[in-house]
């Protein structure tokens, strides 16, 4: 349709005039311009390069979180709207919402400053505030010549002093809420959060608002933890955890009040299609999943 309209428009022009000839658009390759539009060779249109809209990401792609140097200042971030890099919708429940700034959280609690010995150190809580990118509150702590954001615990407030340690002694420590210790240094039954799965990797478990885990027992250099889902996890004793419960305990009791507030939070409405409740609906008695282990124990064949 567009090609026919372009051909009729070009036929209506006087091609003898050099001024009009210079203004003729060049949209088609050389082979197609003379055949389809019956134009003289002087009006031959150059070939064009096709545009690839679904090109794959390069193998050298680095996330923007890795490109930017750590800072306590808010960083502007762009919303995805539930789309991936090709523009296709991957998550239908995401879209819109108020603009948000990202604050870099340091999930590795025991991180000594450069040029210092890896010894326990203290930090002071400067402020505890709301974070739009997560359900828990965050705390700005300062120690030495640096500041950083961490996940705040339930009773953490400005002016508190927290301890970060990597030492495992013969006796269990009397840790205070907000302190970070290896699991091997904590007494059995301690409530913990922000647990590492591997030493030095940073907290990956129990980071949501109001959640906490329990240190059940310690066996042969490993620690058994009960997650908020009641599932048990086995990690090395040298993995770091924070003592206490994550802040914003009443997060699950908030009242949204209206549909518009969910749109402010970037949540799109679900389909209104009625679905018959089948076997998936309702509560069931299910056995607990097996214990998840992050400990690479030697196999029986290797020991024999």
Swiss-Prot record:
InterPro entries linked to this entry: NA-bd_OB-fold (IPR012340), Rib_uL2_dom2 (IPR014722), Ribosomal_uL2 (IPR002171), Ribosomal_uL2_C (IPR022669), Ribosomal_uL2_RNA-bd_dom (IPR022666), Translation_prot_SH3-like_sf (IPR008991)
Compartments it resides in: Mitochondrion
Biological processes per GO annotation: mitochondrial translation
Gene3D superfamilies: 2.30.30.30, Nucleic acid-binding proteins
One function term, GO molecular function aspect: structural constituent of ribosome
Source species, domain of life: Eukaryota
Quaternary structure, from the entry: Component of the mitochondrial ribosome large subunit (39S) which comprises a 16S rRNA and about 50 distinct proteins.
Family according to the record: Belongs to the universal ribosomal protein uL2 family.
Protein name: Large ribosomal subunit protein uL2m
Organism: Rattus norvegicus (Rat)
Primary gene name: Mrpl2
